Structures are given as C-alpha cells and as structure tokens.
A protein has these predicted regions:
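Charged, compositionally biased, marginally structured helical/coil segments
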Residues: 1-120
Length: 120
C-alpha cells in the first residue's frame, strides 16, 4: 500500500482519536503532496479574455496534475518531517518548548509512515 494511501486512511482515525500532532502532520503532508503535483498555469492564456470567451463546461476549471512516483511521495514526506525537526531544533527558548515538542511529535508521525511497508 502506498505511503499516500496509508496517510489518507490514517487521517480519519487520528481525528477520531483527537491526536492533534497526527492530524496536523497528516493534513500538512497531504497538502504538500497535492502542491507538489500541481502544474504551473500559463496565465497568459487566461488573461484578457472577455466573459464570453471564458472556458465553460464540466471539468474546464480543473487544473492539470503531475503524477508523483512513490519515491517522489517519500521525498516530499521526508522533507516535511525534516522541516519540522529543523524548526524544533531552532526553538531553544523555554517559552517555545511546547511548540518544539509538538513539531517533534508531528515529525515522528510522518517518519513512521516512511518506515512502514511499501515505502520505496
């Protein structure tokens, strides 16, 4: 089973369990995966169209998407975990201890998905 699918399946369970770290990490990682699949839009094609020339119909507003390989998914999730660990390491002031702990917990959630079956 793919990393993305396991993450999508884990999100509702984390929400039911009220696991804030898991919910936050999974939502952010899934959004990062969606963003990584986005294809740049050529705004020159859309700019300056009169209302009558605007695209109309089912699916015309859908954006093209790239297909990430499983390796690409793993790389994005690993990068999301690394960002959290880097930020947590920078939060050294006692006032930020709770936030650093939260970020480390989120990184641990993401790294668990990379250690499971079907990661590469």
């Amino acid at each position: 089973m793919s990393v993305r699918l396991r993450m999508r399946q884990a999100l509702p369970a984390a929400m039911r369990a009220r696991d804030k770290a898991a919910v936050s990490a999974l939502r952010a990682a899934l959004a990062a995966l969606d963003n990584a699949e986005a294809v740049p839009v050529d705004e020159a094609e859309l700019r300056g169209l009169a209302l009558e020339q605007s695209p109309v119909g089912v699916g015309v507003t859908e954006a093209a998407r790239r297909e990430l390989s499983e390796r690409g998914v793993v790389d994005v999730v690993r990068a999301e975990a690394a960002v959290r660990l880097d930020v947590a390491a920078q939060l050294t002031a006692p006032a930020h201890a709770d936030r650093a702990t939260q970020l480390r917990a989120e990184a641990a959630v993401l790294l668990r998905f990379l250690d499971g079956p079907g990661t590469a």
